[in-house]
Amino acid sequence: VLLCLLGLGCRSPQSLGRLAQPSAATTAAVSERASWVEAQLWTLTLEQKIGQLFAIRARGIFQSADDPGYRELVRLIEQFEVGGVVFFQGDPYTQAILANDLQRRSRLPLLVAQDTEWGVAMRVSRTTNFPRAMAIGATGNPAYAYAVGYITAREARALGVHQLYAPVADVNNNPFNPIINVRAFGEDPHLVATMVQAFVRGVGRAGAIATVKHFPGHGDTAIDSHSDLPLLPFDRTRLDTLELVPFRAAIAAGVPSVMTGHLALPSLEPTPHLPASLSRRITHDLLRIELGFDGLVVTDALEMQGVTKYFGVGEAAVRALEAGADVLLLSEDVEAARAAILQAIATGRLTEARIDASVSRILQLKARLNLHRERLVDLKAIPQVVSIAPHLAVSQAIARASLTLLRNEGSVLPLPDVPLIPRRLLVVSLSDSDDPATGRFFVQAIREVAPDYPVSTRLLDVRSHTDDYRSVLQTATQHDLVIVAAYVFVRSGSGRIRLPEAHRAFLDSLIAQGKPVVLIAFGNPYVIMDLKSQPAAYVVAYSGGESTQRAASQALFGQAEFSGKLPITIPGYFRRGDGLELPQVVPRRAYPEEVGMRSEQLYRVDSLLEAAIRQQAFPGAAVAIGRGQAIVWLKGYGHYTYHADQRITPQSIFDLASLTKVVVTTTAAMQLYEAGKLDLDAPVVRYLPEFGQNGKERVTIRQLLSHTAGLAPFHPFHRMGIISAEAVRQAILSDTLIYEPGTQSRYSDLGMIVLGWVIERITGQPLDQYAEEHIFRPLGMRNTGFRPVGRPDTTVVPTEIDTVFRHRLIQGEVHDETAWILGGVAGHAGLFSTAADLARFAYMMINEGRIGGRQFLKPETIRLFTTPVDPQHAGTRALGWDTKSPQGYSSAGRFFSLKSFGHTGFTGTSLWIDPEQQLFVILLTNRVYPTRDNQKHLAVRPALADLVWQAIIGPPQLNLEALLP
């Protein structure tokens, strides 16, 4: 089902793998590769062959030409002719440049490898950072594993890497394992197997080499092989039913490479302290013969103490080759290891034929990767591949789908993103390191998601003292809720994966205070086992990457769902498969690709708006674009005026003009209709008897809403000497009809002014007060409202320089003269708002009236009010709303469906919603500055709508099939 939802069709993981396999090489290509391999083997000396077995360390950071590390790297490549390098920390361009440099220096192409368990970001900055494998396991969706493998391989190849040391095929069924933990997909061997297969196929589809690790399984160990030799005291039956299951699946999926682990398994290898990586019984007999693997075998790093505590450099290299390994990874001394191998051949312990077998596999992989023809990477292509929006969108989608809510006492979550009652939040970051930046991104994300909350922050890490903990506990008493973000990660060689004791004691004391505590595990999911008491809410996020922290901040405040299922058991607390589900209730910010749109197409919005500003269609604009559950574009352009320094932002407040009609007056009418207080077919005089003058007695509410009431479009009261609110009211009430009601449609401000008075009469409240209490506050539109006249406000985007009536720049007061005479509050104009606030309103409309966990409007009410009432006489008019014109000009452009509904405002504002595509486009401008005579904006509205519609690539959800070519 999940695969179907992701647009991959209802395929099994096996069929997904078949779909993903690259096309078979032609017979000629296979023959050409084989000839090249044979030719190299024929010409290589024994010493050169041995050199091909080594993969050495390289750093993708800048190093001067005389840097000792760089010089040693070059020496090993040029003199020892090593077969490959393994890149560690670096940045994209530096690594790619160095990879090209080293390839040029090497006689044979180098096989370049890298650890990429959570993307290239595991080693290289500014690349796509994916959630850890256990997070993918929590989604239950192998399509995500495939996508991560594919994207990681694409980015790796762009940076000169061919072999990925990923995925981890270990089954993490030991809560105290200090080194695997979230690096594994879970504790169920069949889930792990499915995810491993998908990842391997994704890597292969992108043209790279996957390497499953750590054979025969590092998941149920209590020792880190970086520090010592872990022991797996299990019999063969246990290994067959647990540890070996994912490796069998990977081999069945055609994995090209396997990494053997430094693991002691007495049931398979009785020799004391002999790890699997050096054991012929395990590497050759089990992996190669019994499991039928004939690909490349790579040892885990030979510099790790799981080997070095028991074997010297030379002996370890010889034993690895005796065992059946092909690549000797990170030997501490290549020269000594090579000498030992030569000596072993001289004494008959090893044969040259044995060396040839491994070198042949290495060369075959290099040829398969086409390195014999092209070994360099194109630096100009890196920005087109690495960390691009589609890749980041996949990371974000996985992070969101993985979030696992295991405890939610008192329904403390979700928190309202716009609180009706002020609540003080304290965010405490608990770190097992000394990095002062820990938690900063999460706090920033919370402030972006919920800017109305006062948020205090504290960091407690390994440097903290007793006084620091005491101070935070005191601070917590002054807050309403505490969010604790626990950053406890797997760290090679640390030998631990637990909360530091001081952190544990602090958490227990904090929970004992009685304030609600939300604990989020950004890393080790087992940390709750260290506590004596339980927090109100416990969220497992598995990872500490930006996408995960962003997703967690959204989910805490209802902007993302909780749907992940625990892929492990937390003994005494939670079972595998546990996970409470909470839906998303308010819109979230997202990458366009997350809702079936292309970022590349939406980037053209920038060009359109910037060109319009240059052509003086308007000084500034704010745009909000949303689809499905997300806002994908929220941006300001230009300035308040052509000569001002103040820039437009999504929070800039605009005069909405006639958008007031739909956001306030029509919405209020919908609410009163649902409450049974407003009969659409009742005459207006039922609610407003004084309206029954000069033939208007039979005008209905429906006719006011559909602009078929027979009323004049407007009257220029300010030019007629009618400049008091009461005089305007009396003039409208006594006005005569200009056509028979119901026979035609003439857009009328007067009808919506009257409807505003009807709403006030029914509710007993002024229109602005009703809207604040029943529309803006429930929708979280905190910067929306009517504004009194006579109080200019320079923080509001200005409209016109009025040279006729008010004789000043209109800024912070309603532009419409009639609304201004009426005191700034009217049913047709007067509302001020932001693109961000209107996006919440539009979200509610495309979400069938639901927002914030409540039904704000019924779906059938929305359909009633947004469907044309009488195409013959009312044209495209619905109730309050306009709909898309089937022909001719439409501000909704050419492609919005005929079910689309929207409205425009005289000041240069517009809102269009397409329910078929679950799409909305909001454009706010001040095109009337400096004068209303400017009409250039009329071309911008449909052009924007067309650009947005053309960005659609599928249903409003992540479509992996469309994103992964």
Language-model regions, residue ranges each:
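Short, conserved catalytic-motif segment at the N-terminal edge
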Residues: E594-L656, K677-D679, R686, Q693, ...
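Active-site-adjacent structural elements in enzyme catalytic domains
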Residues: P92-L111, G140-A158, S360, Q364
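Active-site SXXK
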Residues: Y603-E610, V623, Q629, S652-A682, ...
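Short, surface-exposed loop or secondary-structure junction motifs
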Residues: T641, N694-L898
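Flexible glycine/proline-enriched surface loops and loop-helix/loop-strand junctions
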Residues: I180-N181, L268-E269, A381-Q384, R589-Y591, ...
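Short, gly/Ser/Thr-rich active-site loops of penicillin-recognizing serine hydrolases
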Residues: L350, I355-S360, Q364-H372, S456-S464, ...
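Preference for extracellular/luminal or secreted protein segments
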Residues: C10-R75, I289, Y310-A590, R598
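Second-shell residues forming the walls of enzyme active-site clefts
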Residues: T45, V85, Q95-L110, V120-M122, ...
